[in-house]
């Protein structure tokens, strides 16, 4: 390669690396600001936010978690931030709630069909909590389809936990499952099923269960006013901690 071409190629590589570093820095700031905004608005979740470390990653097209890290796609982050940053907050909280309710380590998942239903059940459970969470940082008014489905399900189950939803979904026809997936499936669950995550199942689950119990105690003793606008979260914590 001639010297002049080597120089041009070197400049090109340098500029690309600089762009990547700038993009990474912007994405890290977006995640940091999202976490801080929600931690201030929902102080009872501060310890949980501290337990899940955000990282910008090319391993996902959206967002996902393995219970230790929160993986976020840089492309998705930038595009979503431009459209509506509340969606980033919701997805961040979506991942946190999966961890608190230990959806990642459920032992019901033995076959691929179970995995599909469990993924959907877990997403419905956390979306329902967020739709009942009247916090400006994460609130987007649920559409009529969601409201009607919640009404129907709550006629059968008092609290829409993932366990409860799993059994309700087993009664659904395929076309209804597809429609529900279009409405409620949001994040990337493939991190749940990696050999590394399954091997550390017991210890990770125990850590989040302990955090969940402490959170319920804190809300009941100190933060009733702070959690007053989130009956769905309180009900979920009580149901999961029984």
What are these regions (language model features)?
Residues 1-89, 96-242:
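Short, functionally important secondary-structure microenvironments
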């Amino acid at each position: 390669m001639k010297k002049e071409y080597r120089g041009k190629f070197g400049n090109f590589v340098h500029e690309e690396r600089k762009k990547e570093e700038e993009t990474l820095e912007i994405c890290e700031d977006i995640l940091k600001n999202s976490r801080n905004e929600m931690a201030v608005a929902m102080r009872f979740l501060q310890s949980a936010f501290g337990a899940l470390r955000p990282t910008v990653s090319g391993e996902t097209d959206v967002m996902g978690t393995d219970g230790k890290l929160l993986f976020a796609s840089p492309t998705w982050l930038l595009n979503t931030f431009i459209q509506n940053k509340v969606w980033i907050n919701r997805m961040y909280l979506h991942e946190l709630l999966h961890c608190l309710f230990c959806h990642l380590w459920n032992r019901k998942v033995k076959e691929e069909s179970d995995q599909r239903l469990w993924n959907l059940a877990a997403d419905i459970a956390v979306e329902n909590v967020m739709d009942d969470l009247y916090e400006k940082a994460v609130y987007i008014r649920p559409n009529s389809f969601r409201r009607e489905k919640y009404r129907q399900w709550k006629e059968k189950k008092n609290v829409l936990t993932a366990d409860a939803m799993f059994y309700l979904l087993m009664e659904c026809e395929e076309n209804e499952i597809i429609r529900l997936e279009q409405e409620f499936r949001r994040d990337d669950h493939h991190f749940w099923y990696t050999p590394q995550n399954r091997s550390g199942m017991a210890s990770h689950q125990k850590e989040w269960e302990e955090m969940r119990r402490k959170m319920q105690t804190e809300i009941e003793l100190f933060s009733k006013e702070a959690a007053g606008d989130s009956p769905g979260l309180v009900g979920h914590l009580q149901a999961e901690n029984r």
